[in-house]
Amino acid sequence: MLQGKLRRSSLKAKLLVSFVIVLILPSIVIGWTSYQQAKTNFNETILQSAEDNVKILNNVINKEIDSKKVDAVYFTKLFNGVSYGTDQLQNVQNKLEEYNKLHPEIEAIYTGSSTGQFIQSPSIQMPDGYNPTERDWYKEAAKKSGEVVITAPYKSSTTGNIVITIAKQNEDKSGVLGIDLIINDIVNTSKMVNIGKTGFVAIFDQSKHVIAHPTMKPGDKIEEKVEKELYKQETGDFKFKLDGDDRNITFITNKQTGWKIAGIMPSKEIIEAANPIFYKTLTVIGISLIIGGVLIYFIIASIISPLKQLVISSKKISEGDLTETITVHSKDEIGQLGESFNEMAASLHHVISNINTSASHVAASSEELTASMKQTSEATEQITQAIEQVSSGAEIQTKEVEEGATLLEGVTEGIQRVADSSSLVSTASMYTKKKAEDGGKLVEQTVNQMQLIHESVSQSDKVIVLLDDKSKQIGAILEVIQHIAEQTNLLALNAAIEAARAGEQGRGFAIVADEVRKLAEQSGQSSTEIGKLVKEIQFDIKETVSSMKQVGTEVQSGLVVANETKQSFAEILKSTDDTVVQIDNMVDVAKQMTVDARQVSASINEIAATIEENAASVQNIAGSSEEQLASVDEINAAAVHLSQMAEELQEMIGKFKV
């Protein structure tokens, strides 16, 4: 169905659809690809930012814990079984208090012996029956002898701070040292980390509870769907929904504590970050479509306009107007088609003109042939009649000779008939003379008409020479315009340089100067193109001058031929006059022969035998004359048919305007 519509559509519609598809589809693909690429880039950038922030927070945690692990190792080397003796307890207490004063980030530092002794700074009264060996921190450190143990975060019962205990068994296994590290600084640091606009960092312990979160409280249980992905691997990223919004999360696991440090950000921020690029892309596509649409309009117009002109001219030629031509403005395929069309029209014009001329000549020749054949037919018929009469006379003369009485009268009658035939020939000669005079007048009119044509050709030659001079003046004016355009371009360039030197104050002037320079360049280019056209016109004028000179020469030759024809008709007329005089003389002689016929009576007997022989020959001649008359009639009929065909051909050619 679509293919059928395209076949019925105009060339303009087909070109428009093709250009629109070529323009819009790549623009949409490029725009959509750019938008998706921007989203991907922003997503990677934000994820990278989240990973960097998570790593920074992980390093902060490691730094805090590492320093306390070093301190714990130091004290476990310092304290031993002797340190828990009664005389050394105060010394241990002093060292712990000194350390506590130097490290405000800790809540307490303490040590417990395997015998149940417990020393702490700051010093507080422990409940009765308190035995450090029964505490989790002591058991875990003793269980992992030689390693530093870090407990899960918990809330201090005395201060309410969130703390972790860093514990290590003494080297001699006489006791365990513990440092309660306040992690409020770590929590506060995590709250200060921003990912994107509304993203944040959260910390979860190894028991899947919240340590730090902007909206959840420490100790809260995390959601099961998040927990499942978060604790499935050491590091990674995934997406989940929170309060109906898509969130991206990237996380790592702190190797010392087992905590999960996660960077969480809304997915809509990626879209919002990519939207400006999307809108800019839409704007660029819109502008491109507008500019492309304008260009497409002019391109299609440059194709369709000459084709429409070609269709109109073709229709005129099909209707018989062979003078129609089209103006060619380009050298592309359409321009070549236009030139070929003009060449075809010129060739057809030349062919029809030649056929018309030939048809006229054939018609004239056929008419002349018809007239000549008619005259020949009449003359032949007269000769046949005369021969028949001579034959009859010969028979009569033969009979009269045989009878011997009526011979002289028969001869006299025959001579009288010859005189009558001579009179008829004289009449035909007078008719021929009249036709020759008419032909002479027609030739004289032709000579006059050829003279008028010669004068018109001479006048056209003068006009074309004047047009050549005018085209040369136009060429000189175009050179001046091109020189002015070059000077304007140079001035615009100088103005742009001065405007650039003026800085921001000359920026507007620089734009104007640049536009002037562009206009100057366009003027120069246009004047150059016009110059080319003027040169082509001058070349065509020279060709026309040469052709007009050739036409003048041909017209002059025609005048010479026409004058010669006129002279020939004059000679024919003179010859006809001479013939008429001779025929008149022949008539007079025939009359004289009638008078003298009686004088030849004595000779009739001698020629009687000869007359009998001639009678048979006359019969043969009469038969041949009749056959010749039939042939002349056939030629005459063919000439008439040829004349009719020539007239029909002229009528057909007359439909064409040449």
Curated annotation (Swiss-Prot):
Membrane topology, Cytoplasmic segments: 1-14, 305-658
Glutamate methyl ester (Glu) PTM sites in chain numbering: 368, 627, 634
Topology term for the membrane: Multi-pass membrane protein
Keyword terms of this UniProt record: Cell membrane, Chemotaxis, Coiled coil, Membrane, Methylation, Transducer, Transmembrane, Transmembrane helix
Stretches assigned to the Extracellular side: 36-283
InterPro entries associated with the record: dCache_1 (IPR033479), HAMP_dom (IPR003660), MCPsignal_dom (IPR004089), Sensor-like_sf (IPR029151)
GO biological process terms held by the UniProt record: chemotaxis; signal transduction
Pfam families linked to this entry: dCache_1 (PF02743), HAMP (PF00672), MCPsignal (PF00015)
Superkingdom of source: Bacteria
Positions of the Methyl-accepting transducer domain: 372-622
Modified residues (Glutamate methyl ester (Gln)): 592
Membrane-spanning parts: 15-35, 284-304
PROSITE patterns to which the protein is assigned, alphabetical: CHEMOTAXIS_TRANSDUC_2, HAMP
Family: Belongs to the methyl-accepting chemotaxis (MCP) protein family.
Name of the molecule in the record: Probable methyl-accepting chemotaxis protein BT9727_0469
Taxonomic lineage from the root: Bacteria, Bacillati, Bacillota, Bacilli, Bacillales
